[in-house]
Amino acid sequence: MSHQCYLTGKKTMVVNAVIRRGKARREGGVGRKTTGITKRVQKANLHKKLIRENGVLKRVWLSAAALRTLNKGPYQGVELACRC
């Protein structure tokens, strides 16, 4: 089972970690300068939950955003098996 949201498709992303020095112009400096850029991993906020989809129980990964949306009930035929 991959670490990917079952409903929204959110998963791990590769993003840039930017290191800067200097003082911002709005604070009276000459501006921020980039001194280094490296790759880093940004993980989705995933939780393993039990859902009922068309009467069948499934244990899946759900993002926090999908859990909030699921509590409102807009996904057709999908509901949390336990409101814990």
From Swiss-Prot:
GO cellular component: ribonucleoprotein complex; ribosome
Cross-referenced SUPFAM superfamilies: L28p-like
Residue ranges crossing the lipid bilayer per the database entry: none
Keywords carried by this UniProt record: Ribonucleoprotein, Ribosomal protein
InterPro entries: Bacterial_rp_bL28, Ribosomal_bL28, Ribosomal_bL28/bL31-like_sf, Ribosomal_bL28_bact-type, Ribosomal_bL28_sf
Example GO BP: translation
Keyword Ribosomal protein: yes
Gene3D superfamilies on file: Ribosomal protein L28/L24
GO molecular function terms listed in the Swiss-Prot or TrEMBL record: structural constituent of ribosome
PANTHER family the UniProt entry points to: 50S RIBOSOMAL PROTEIN L28 (PTHR39080), LARGE RIBOSOMAL SUBUNIT PROTEIN BL28A (PTHR39080:SF1)
Family of the protein in this entry: Belongs to the bacterial ribosomal protein bL28 family.
Name the UniProt record assigns to this protein: Large ribosomal subunit protein bL28
Provenance organism: Deinococcus geothermalis (strain DSM 11300 / CIP 105573 / AG-3a)
Gene name of this polypeptide: rpmB
